[in-house]
A protein has these predicted regions:
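Enriched for short, Lys/Arg-rich terminal
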Residues: 2-5, 16-24, 54, 62-85
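Nucleotide phosphate-binding site architecture
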Residues: 12, 45, 82
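Flexible interhelical turns and helix-capping residues at alpha-helix boundaries
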Residues: 15, 19, 34-37
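A short, surface-exposed loop/turn module that caps and links secondary-structure elements
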Residues: 28-53
Length: 85
């Protein structure tokens, strides 16, 4: 099954501000998520969110299996990303 990936505008703007190499690594990982959203992912403790590691960056997302949706919650450097979660 292929999931639909939802990336909010604020996340797209963050991606645009990141470097080309970082942006391409993140996008390729997001495309991979569409087919297998839990592969190489870890659940964030005490939340419904998942995370994947891409070098020093993290992608936080939620999965809605009944609708086949993946909603990207946040993308950022590992030292800053967990302050909200």
């Amino acid at each position: 099954m292929i999931y639909t990936l939802i990336i909010p505008n604020k996340i797209n703007k963050k991606l645009d501000r990141s470097g080309i190499k970082t942006k391409s690594r993140i996008i390729s990982k997001l495309i991979f998520l569409k087919t297998n959203p839990r592969h190489h992912a870890e659940r964030i403790k005490d939340t419904e969110f998942w995370k994947i590691r891409i070098g020093k960056f993290r992608v936080i997302y939620s999965i809605e299996d009944n609708k086949l949706l993946i909603l990207i919650i946040n993308i950022g450097h590992r030292k800053n990303i967990y302050k909200k979660y």
